Amino acid sequence: HIKCPVFVAREWFRHRIGSFNEFSARYSEVPNEFFVPAESDVRTQVGKPGAYRFEPVDAELSRETVELIQKNNEQAYEAYSYMISRGIAKELARAVLPVAMYTQFYWTVNARSLMNFLSLRQHESAQRDIREYANAVYELASPVMPVTFAAWEQNSRIAP
């Protein structure tokens, strides 16, 4: 069972391995839970796609960015809640919700596909947000399959 921002889940679902069963905002009301970065995590992207690096921004811009994200999340949820309270269908009201909203899903995956996912998403070039989740998955899964993970580590983290 995984709970993460929608933008992280969309990266996760790009892996066409295993099966996913996601919480449905079409049939259930969405909780007021959104991702807001820490001020220290606000950075700028320098370079071309695929070959860029991140650099920190000044404290003022960092604070302003976090406030804008928080405000957007709050306004979006207010609009969503208003529509729900007026009887608008959940499947339509959800259209105003941002990708910073948290979602939940169940993920079923075999060991080989799990190791492929980890080798890609724990890599330093992976998006930091999904890398943190991949690290957590590793911490949960490796004690369950210690022999399998030991062989994977000895094979330079290359899935068989």
Question: In which residue ranges do the predicted regions lie?
Answer:
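Family-specific signature for flavin-dependent thymidylate synthase
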Residues: H1-P160
